[in-house]
Amino acid sequence: MLYILFRYLLWPLFMIIMRPQVYNLKGLRVKGGAIYACNHLSMLDPVMIAFLSPRIVHFMAKKELFNGLGKAFFRGLMVFPVNRHTADIASLKRAMEVLKDGKVFGIFPEGKRSVTGELDELEKGTAFLALKSGAPVIPM
């Protein structure tokens, strides 16, 4: 699995270069399905979350990334496509399956990367998933 390979090969390099400061790490150790809700300020945010989480984190990413080799690459990283321009029911169902299977789902509630560094308007997907699944939302 590409996710595991990247995580263990690149984690030491990541920790040396990025030197992340983590608060409330035990909050990430929740059992069962959980939603990691994170601000999205950098393209490296999903990588940082994956490296810092004690569990495998599943993500959605814009469907435009799933062309050609991107499809196999992102699927190997536990990422599935979402159409950000519609209410993508299939992607929400897939996220629900991840949570019902007791896994961790990472989501960026704004639905996109912030260009200003400020919090943008939140999309409804995070609240919908939390209410429908009963999974706890862990802010990061």
Residue ranges and their predicted role:
Residues 7, 16-140:
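Soluble catalytic domains of membrane acyltransferases
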Residues 1-6:
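Helix-enriched interaction subdomains in cytosolic or periplasmic regions
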